[in-house]
């Protein structure tokens, strides 16, 4: 109980005392759900409903009118609209997929088929030969089973972007400077490759042998590429550029196998329709074309990063 003459009230911080209700007429004073936060915007209980809930309920549901701190409380209205809500890590790699795209538009996307960067130096040649060796192994192991091929290889395809983004992120932190949009570009690339994996997992689940290969491949490739990037980051980007060239070739062959009837053209998974804004009638071949366009974008991004003669982690080509 607080008395009328109690000096404690005068010493209470303003941000706490606003939660006390003092009666000047009565000797006794009552509490009205004392605020528990010491920062601005603190939530406190009043009549069983939090202040934050009251603010949230009073706002319009249009994301453009809701203050940024409250936007993450709003759930998407559409059933499968999560990819349209996420910004940053959920963005598509190509602007064509930021809006609904028709199957004809998808088919006519210019991904510059056959585009190849001719090695200009010893490091470029070194990166190219490594990729050709990896391609030979993949061809020998998977043959023309392209669904299995992409499920396994997309598990390692998502590693380079994350490693490159991590190194640039650490550079920015230790040098106390902003090195631009390259971090976001690389991390987005990694997330985009992960979406490729999740899409094809809806078509085919890997067998026991493939799962063992995936675990071993992740261990070897992650550690190997991390050392590679630490020693020669420019060459590492050239290496990824060549990897993506081979990925485009693989998806060209994947598309051809579907057209020839060697691979069943099943309905596109739900996740692919949401992620690439594909129409409801989209099929597997349309997913292949969308993924191929992404790979072409990654090819160009990594070759562009490697093209700088004065390459550094501070360099930002975007």
Curated annotation (Swiss-Prot):
* Gene3D superfamilies recorded: Alternative oxidase
**Would you tell me the Gene Ontology cellular component terms?**
membrane; mitochondrion; mitosome
Give the reaction(s) catalysed: 2 a ubiquinol + O2 = 2 a ubiquinone + 2 H2O
Details of cofactor binding: Binds 2 iron ions per subunit.
Is Lipoprotein set as a keyword in this record? no
Q: Where does Fe cation 1 bind?
A: 154, 193, 196, 295
Q: How does it sit in the membrane?
A: Multi-pass membrane protein
**Cofactor(s) recorded in Swiss-Prot or TrEMBL:** Fe cation
Keyword entries, A-Z: Electron transport, Iron, Membrane, Metal-binding, Mitosome, Oxidoreductase, Respiratory chain, Transmembrane, Transmembrane helix, Transport
For the ligand (Fe cation 2), the binding residues are 193, 244, 295, 298
UniProt family annotation:
Belongs to the alternative oxidase family.
What function is annotated for this protein?
Answer: Alternative oxidase which function may be to reoxidize reducing equivalents produced by glycolysis such as ubiquinol.
Question: What name is this protein filed under?
Answer: Ubiquinol oxidase
């Amino acid at each position: 109980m607080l008395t009328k003459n109690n000096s404690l009230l005068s010493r209470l911080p303003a941000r706490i005392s606003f939660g006390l209700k003092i009666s000047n007429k009565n000797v006794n004073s009552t509490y009205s759900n004392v605020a528990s936060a010491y920062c601005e915007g603190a939530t406190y209980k009043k009549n069983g409903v939090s202040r934050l809930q009251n603010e949230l309920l009073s706002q319009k549901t249009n994301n453009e009118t809701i203050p940024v701190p409250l936007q993450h409380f709003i759930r998407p209205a559409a059933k499968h609209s999560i990819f349209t809500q996420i910004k940053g890590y959920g963005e598509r790699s190509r602007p064509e997929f930021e809006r609904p795209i028709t199957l004809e538009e998808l088919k006519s996307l210019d991904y510059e088929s056959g585009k190849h960067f001719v090695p200009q130096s010893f490091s470029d040649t070194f990166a190219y030969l490594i990729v050709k060796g990896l391609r030979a192994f993949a061809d020998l192991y998977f043959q023309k089973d392209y669904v299995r091929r992409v499920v396994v290889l997309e598990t390692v395809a998502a590693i380079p972007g994350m490693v490159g983004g991590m190194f640039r992120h650490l550079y920015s932190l230790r040098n106390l400077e902003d090195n631009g949009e390259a971090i976001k570009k690389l991390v987005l690339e990694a997330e985009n490759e992960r979406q490729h994996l999740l899409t094809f997992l809806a078509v085919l689940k890997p067998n026991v042998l493939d799962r063992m290969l995936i675990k071993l491949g992740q261990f070897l490739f992650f550690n190997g590429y991390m050392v590679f990037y630490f020693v020669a980051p420019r060459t590492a980007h050239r290496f990824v550029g060549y990897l993506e060239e081979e990925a485009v070739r693989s998806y060209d062959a994947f598309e051809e196998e579907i057209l020839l009837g060697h691979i069943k053209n099943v309905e596109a998974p739900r996740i692919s329709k949401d992620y690439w804004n594909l129409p409801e009638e989209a099929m597997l071949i349309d997913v292949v074309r969308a993924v191929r366009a992404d790979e072409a974008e990654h090819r160009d991004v990594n070759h562009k990063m490697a093209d700088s003669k004065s390459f550094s982690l501070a360099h930002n080509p975007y």
